[in-house]
Amino acid sequence: MKEYKAIITDFDLTIADTAFLIEDCLYTNAARFGYDLDRGILRDGIGMTAESIYLDAGCSAAEAKRLHDEYIPYSAEIMREQTELYPGVADGLASLHAKGILLAVLSLKASDQIWRPLERAGVDKYIHSVISPDEVEKHKPEPDGIFYLSEKTGIALEDILYVGDSVTDMKTALNAGVDFAAVCTGAVTADQFAEMGAEIIHPTFADLCRAICAEID
């Protein structure tokens, strides 16, 4: 594995154990308005916008937009205060930072829903940037978030690694022209990532961090 100057990571299901929180918020938000949606479909959509997930769950475009607009404030406090990082992530981020690698998070979430869990875990000091919808207009799988960090830091795209757990994450890296590392803490398996052409695949973010640091050592 080559040495990278910057690593950008997805948040949900990559470094943060949020599968149940997101699924439950999507479901209970819709239930407030009389919808009984398939939890499996909601869970499989994690990584996309709430509007896209509600569309996949069978809502009309107007219904999906309404539920999306209600979901944002409904879920905000829950995500800020109940999100926890996966085991080993804190140590992994510390190790990467100690190696001089610039670290950033790219997510569809508002930045405070990311910074607060990072602060609670004591790892916010390792993160250079959180790239949220506040920073870029076009979201994953569009490459704008990765371009934003490259332009902000002056780090070339060939020196950036993007890490994620989903097909959307892989498409984002491909669209940006950066290397991609898959972690299998989401819905996509290692075999599925390999079939799609992923070359760097690890069970967890912590495993990936250990592999990167071992290469530098």
Regions found by a protein language model. Give the residues of each.
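Glycine-rich phosphate-binding loop signature in dinucleotide/nucleotide-binding domains
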Residues: 1-2, 98-101, 153-159, 215-216
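Structural recognition of alpha->loop->beta junctions
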Residues: 122-132, 192-209
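Conserved Lys-Pro-Asp/Glu-containing loop-to-beta segment of HAD-superfamily phosphomonoesterases
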Residues: 6, 140-170
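Acidic, Mg2+-coordinating phosphoryl-transfer loop and its flanking beta/alpha structural elements
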Residues: 161-200
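Short acidic capping loops at alpha-helix termini that bridge into adjacent secondary structure
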Residues: 37-41, 62-63, 124-129, 157-161
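Substrate-recognition/cap helix-loop segment adjacent to the acidic, metal-dependent catalytic center
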Residues: 30-33, 52-61, 82, 97-104, ...
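N-terminal helical cap/lid subdomain that shapes the substrate entry/recognition surface
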Residues: 2-90, 95-99, 115
